[in-house]
Amino acid sequence: MFKIVSKYVYSDIFEVIDSANSYEEALNLKHEYELSFMSAYTIEIVEA
């Protein structure tokens, strides 16, 4: 399982915003969130 984690640019707080069962699904979700949030957030994939 993989977690999609976001971090607001002006803060050090991380938040789990979604999860995925496969790495490929996690990459797709990460891409969608990056398109939605633009540069306001850093989006990362973390293996759980």
List the predicted regions and their residue ranges:
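Acidic phosphotransfer microenvironment of two-component signaling modules
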Residues: 24
